[in-house]
Amino acid sequence: MKKLIIISAICIICGISTAQVPVSLKAAVDTALKNNLLVKNEQLKAQYQQMLIKTATVLPKTNIMADAGQINSIYTDTKFGVTQNFSLPRVYTSQKELLQQEWKSSVLSVAVKEALLKKQVAQLFYTMVYVEQKKQLLQYLDSLYTAFYKKASLRLEKGESNLLEKVSAETQLGQINMQLQQLQQDAAVLQIQFQLLLNSTTLFVPKPQPVKMELTATADTTKLKDHATIQLIQQQEQIALASIAVEKSKLLPDLLAGYSNTSIKGTGADNKIYGSGKRFNAIQIGISIPLFAKAQKEKINSAKFSRQIAEHNYTAGLQNIQSEYAAAVAQYNKYKQTVQYFETAALKNASVIISTANQQLANGNINYLEWVQLINQSLIVKSDYTEAIKNLNESIIQLNYFNNQ
């Protein structure tokens, strides 16, 4: 898999034609959730923990004994026996509860990994969209300077201008081409990362769609408790409680049950003579009491401390995610206002500047240096708008992550 992805990346960087498959964000996320190896690994861990639940009732090995010799008298007798130790039902119940809570924790770990994967896929997806927008902006700028370069070359041939115009245009075109090459390399790196997340050798690229995301969920801090990360932290408290119950159950006595079969040769109490063919049966019942339980009680106390740690981790984790959520909301509002400013005023002004500058240059009302300043000013506005869209999308992706979307 890695070799194929590396080969694909080399093809991209070197400009070799490879088939690209447009994909929507939803389809990309679905593919990643299905194929991503880290998610699969967490799912396997969950299956492993689920299978362990069946091991809650594990009995000690059965003891089978055989004796032969002068057991009861001068005669040689034989004795066969079997014993089995086991705990009270409460022990097995508490062990099963602990294993079930650990399994629930592993299931929540899958949810945490999936939520993070959705966020990573969305971030890469819209970063690739951003790079494509930057590429289109540079290509537009390249077309402007290419047209001017041709005019400057023609003016130089006719003696209507000096060499400065042509050299300046060549310099601008060279810088644009260098930036385009850098963008191509950035796109190749993003392609590699995207394929790794989706665990696919297919060259998936973002499907044409609006470059600006829309926030669908409203801000609601009460839902943060339902976030997979917080649920996972909270689950550690349930594991700690189950661990306390398991340690307490170890103070309960263990039971023993046995059965033996023996021969008693010679004259019995009833004055009858018995040979080896006559067998005598007996049952055995015992109990194991933890007389020296100080160490086990210390284990119980340490398990209680583990619960306190889990409680503090939950409180700290909830406070942390609430703080991050508030920061994300503030970032979203800031970038939303910035984008609105560009869309309502700055972009329109930039377009007017470009068209007016081209017209005035053609009419001879401004010189080349003035035209360059005006064009660069307007394109800085367009570039800043692209950056603002990128920042807005990132803030929305972060909020969607907190909202389990």
Residue ranges and their predicted role:
Residues 6-7, 29, 384-405:
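Acidic, low-complexity, intrinsically disordered peripheral segments
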Residues 4-13:
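Sec-dependent N-terminal signal peptides
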Residues 116-231, 238, 328-331, 335:
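Periplasmic alpha-helical coiled-coil/stalk elements that build and connect Gram-negative outer-membrane
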